[in-house]
């Protein structure tokens, strides 16, 4: 009887050990390398430039007319992460945040098309492009919901910045895979 109990106990221990192997978290997706931002969920593509951009405490806002109130609130929340103040009349030497919709003809659409936005990307569900370069941060969404997701990605990046408020030049392209 004692031998049977030991055998059953060993099987139970072996089973639990195997079960624990499947409970260990596994990292999936793109691994960040040193100096890259951690963005979750992982975007379709991130391209980093060679420079960093200094954010100013005052941010000039240019928000397209197709952007809804929820996205405008997300913009304010994003700026608040670094205690930045946004307004439409900030001086031209300030960081500029431009948010708009692809195909609308607004400032974000014009900038995006001149800086790599392609129709094929925006044929996808919830597609957006986030571009940080030359004193400008541009979020161009397929629609206002996609622009919201782009601003949310910017918020995640802002949460990782140090007190010096320097952000790497980059382009993020993302869309949902359904």
Feature locations, PLM:
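Acidic, contiguous N-terminal accessory segments
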Residues: 28-178
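N-terminal secretory signal peptides that target proteins for export/translocation
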Residues: 1-8
